[in-house]
Amino acid sequence: MPDFARRWDVLVAGGGNAALSAAISAARAGASVIVAEHAPVPMRGGNSRHTRNLRALHHRPTEVLTDSYLEDEYFDDLIKVTAGRTDEALARMTIRASQTAPEFLKSCGVRFQPSLSGTLSLARTNAFFLGGGKALLNALYREAERLGIAVLYDTEVQHLAIEDGEVGEAIVAHRGFPERIRARTVIAAAGGFQANRGWLGEYWGEAADRFQIRGTPYAQGGVLKDLLAQGAQQVGDPTQFHAVANDARAPMVDGGLAMRLDCVPFSIVVNRDAKRFHDEGEDLWPKRYAIWGRLVAQQPESRAFAITDSQAIQDFLPSVFPPIKAETIGALAVQLGLDPALLEATVGAYNRAVRPGRFRPTELDDCRTEGLSPPKSHWARRIERKPFVAYPLRPGITFTFLGLRVDDHARVLMTNGRASANLFAAGEIMAGNILGQGYLAGFGMTIGTVFGRIAGEEAARLART
């Protein structure tokens, strides 16, 4: 039975990578730590269950990373995907600290492997977890247990009582029963509100009911909403989220990484009216895959279709659900519920606009269109080899960008301009400080690890004084 009478040094709200990085760092610094994880054991870990890698600065090749990936290139990649919507000081701090993130995770028992082959082409920039997100979490929870960290599962943090900028106690529901947890410091690491369709609906209307939730159903945003209501500063656009082009046949909740479709750069993508609406070859897929969920969400009925042919199948990771195939574009349209004449016209116009070049699937090649709007800037090849292939798309939402504003000590800033006396934040709940829009593959895990470590160390230091 948990000791609810005890006063802990550090309470961590959340149970994913950011939360465990914080809890472990605090415990290693000598603090007594309790973790409140909303999910039961089989579902523990939030979206970290579905992750694969983190993006890390490195000056030379490592056991799992090729070449080098330095600060200026890293920051330039971030600026491109966010269009400058980032706090540069926090971003650069995160990038620099990412250099030691893999070693920290290794010290927790996490093992790494070289990049997998596929469309994302991350061998130089991202370190992959051996066994994926579940193996990562299992290692972190084992380390937490070894350090004597108390973990409460099925425990929803419903209210963090703030007075004069300081959290006094947490009101929780532990296995359905109300309890209180007292702690000298609190770290909010409970994620965003991507699984809360009601909250999403405030910005997206009925379209939110058609979004597929890629990860945990427990990301309801309760801690975030509670803290914003009590004067924590808001950061990030509430309409922005990380979302990918998911297979429309995927589960509506918790489908994970495998439901993402990586065929977009080697296809044309049309909406319900069989019209293209964006440049499919705009940039390398790791810098663009996270905009496609939003693009699809903006289409009629939040639906789209990737159209390609048999020559492209080998250029991207295979889908869980089989592709839809037909011997003619018209027959393919019938299977998709599209107007055959309109799809034939769209494919025909695209084929006529293609200017062949040297096709290089992992680089920005010179295969492009000319005189077509929207253009296809790279990887443009005529769709002409039978059978023709299609994949139905829906937006798969990963996390939201609305969050808590923090400083470089991971302290939550209040609307009066001051930092909270004892409240810190890490992970998706504060990622909007650095990711104002767009995404870099693996960077969410980097933010969670870096700010989790900072929050844990700072909370432990404060609790001891």
Q: Where do the model's predicted regions map?
A:
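Beta1/beta-strand and adjacent pyrophosphate-binding region of the FAD-binding site
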Residues: F4-A18
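Conserved redox-cofactor binding core of oxidoreductases
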Residues: R44, T94-P178, R182-R184, A195-W199, ...
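A glycine-rich dinucleotide-binding beta-alpha-beta segment and adjacent secondary-structure elements
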Residues: L342-N433, Q437
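Short, well-ordered coil/turn residues at beta-beta hairpins
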Residues: G14, A183, A189-A190, R272, ...
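An active-site-proximal "capping" alpha-helix that borders the catalytic cofactor pocket
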Residues: V223-Q230, G444-L462
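Glycine-rich loop(s) and the adjacent beta-strand/alpha-helix scaffold that form part
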Residues: H174-D247, I454
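Conserved N-terminal/central alpha/beta ligand/cofactor-binding core
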Residues: S32, H38-A150, H159, S267-R276, ...
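An anion/pyrophosphate-binding glycine-rich loop and adjacent beta-alpha core
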Residues: L224-D226, Q230-E344
